[in-house]
């Protein structure tokens, strides 16, 4: 019964192939929302307030500095997700072995027998994609939208027109983080102007600027609330070292092979260098000493198989 339910849940993803037609339209939509917001906050309301003098100018300057900083970080993170390949399986990839610890080649073990006819295996390091006709590492999944296997695939995101996987998952999380902060800021600073629409006082401005302010407030409020939900969900996934796909696959499993504790789970996504935690990038040292950032190998609990 559980197997049937899982199959029904995953059949939904066959409709994701229709997402290919969206293409760069979603990127233009994101930039359009940014443009409307920029016009409402900077050009219509708080830019002109800089010339008023006194505390009004100081407050406007503070808001504009914070707004531009968050906007810069948002766009940096966003385009990092868009233009960074999430990670693909190298040609002729084979799982590594540790001869010093007495490990044998998984391809020569009984786990590999019949692998090409069954994508599941008792050895999570040995899996086969019948669509790509190649071996794939653990935590790797085939994306029906991109038509390829993606390392540590989380999901295919229509907003970034790209898969979110091992090599750009951190950038996606930072995009959510800075989007939430930016949209929350815009909602708060435009709220007095939005409330003024429902008062009896005369509101200065042209119909165009007033409509832009109204639209920007509604859009940013909607995005702030929706992104907050996604951000909370992904914080929970990072804490358990789980992807969105894996959360569906193991929804009845209480123990998880890759859950090494919140600190190590966090570092597997954001790296060990704290200076880079809020920046869409990694240090060369982290890339060298943390192979899991490359998406091919992930440490698991030493005693997991004996539990």
Swiss-Prot record:
Residues 127-177 form the DHHC domain. One of its GO terms (cellular component) is membrane. Its main location: Golgi. The gene is PAT14. Keywords: Acyltransferase, Golgi apparatus, Lipoprotein, Membrane, Palmitate, Transferase, Transmembrane, Transmembrane helix. Belongs to the DHHC palmitoyltransferase family. It is a multi-pass membrane protein. This is Probable protein S-acyltransferase 14. PANTHER family: PALMITOYLTRANSFERASE ZDHHC16 (PTHR12246). InterPro entries: Palmitoyltrfase_DHHC, PFA4/ZDH16/20/ERF2-like. The DHHC domain is required for palmitoyltransferase activity. The active site is at 157 (s-palmitoyl cysteine intermediate). One of its GO terms (biological process) is regulation of reactive oxygen species metabolic process. Signal peptide: none annotated. It holds the Pfam family DHHC. The chain crosses the membrane at residues 22-42, 63-83, 171-191, 213-233. It is found in: Golgi apparatus, trans-Golgi network membrane. GO terms for molecular function: protein-cysteine S-acyltransferase activity; protein-cysteine S-palmitoyltransferase activity. It catalyses: L-cysteinyl-[protein] + hexadecanoyl-CoA = S-hexadecanoyl-L-cysteinyl-[protein] + CoA. Its EC number is 2.3.1.225. Palmitoyl acyltransferase.
């Amino acid at each position: 019964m559980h197997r049937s339910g899982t199959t029904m849940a995953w059949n939904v993803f066959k409709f994701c192939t229709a997402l290919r037609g969206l293409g760069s339209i979603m990127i233009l939509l994101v930039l359009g929302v940014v443009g409307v917001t920029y016009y409402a906050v900077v050009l219509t309301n708080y830019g002109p307030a800089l010339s008023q003098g006194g505390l009004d100018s100081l407050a406007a300057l503070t808001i504009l500095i914070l707004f531009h900083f968050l906007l810069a970080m948002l766009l940096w993170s966003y385009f990092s997700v868009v233009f960074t390949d999430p990670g693909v399986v190298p040609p002729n990839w084979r799982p590594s072995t540790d001869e010093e610890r007495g490990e044998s080649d998984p391809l020569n073990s009984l786990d590999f027998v019949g692998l090409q006819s069954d994508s599941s295996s008792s050895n999570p390091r040995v899996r086969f994609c019948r669509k790509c006709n190649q071996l794939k590492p653990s935590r790797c999944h085939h994306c029906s939208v991109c038509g390829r296997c993606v390392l540590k695939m989380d999901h295919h995101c229509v907003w970034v027109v790209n898969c979110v996987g091992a090599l750009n998952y951190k950038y996606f999380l930072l995009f959510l983080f800075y989007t939430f902060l930016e949209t929350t800021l815009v909602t708060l600073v435009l709220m007095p102007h939005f409330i003024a629409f429902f008062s009896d006082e005369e509101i200065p401005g042209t119909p165009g600027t007033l409509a832009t302010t109204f639209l920007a407030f509604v859009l940013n409020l909607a995005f702030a609330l929706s992104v907050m939900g996604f951000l909370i969900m992904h914080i929970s996934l990072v804490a358990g070292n789980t992807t969105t796909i894996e959360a569906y696959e193991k929804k009845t499993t209480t123990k998880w092979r890759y859950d090494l504790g919140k600190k190590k789970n966090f570092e597997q996504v954001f790296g060990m260098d704290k200076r880079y935690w809020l920046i869409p990038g990694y240090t060369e040292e982290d890339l060298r000493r943390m192979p899991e950032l490359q998406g091919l190998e992930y440490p698991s609990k030493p005693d997991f198989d004996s539990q």
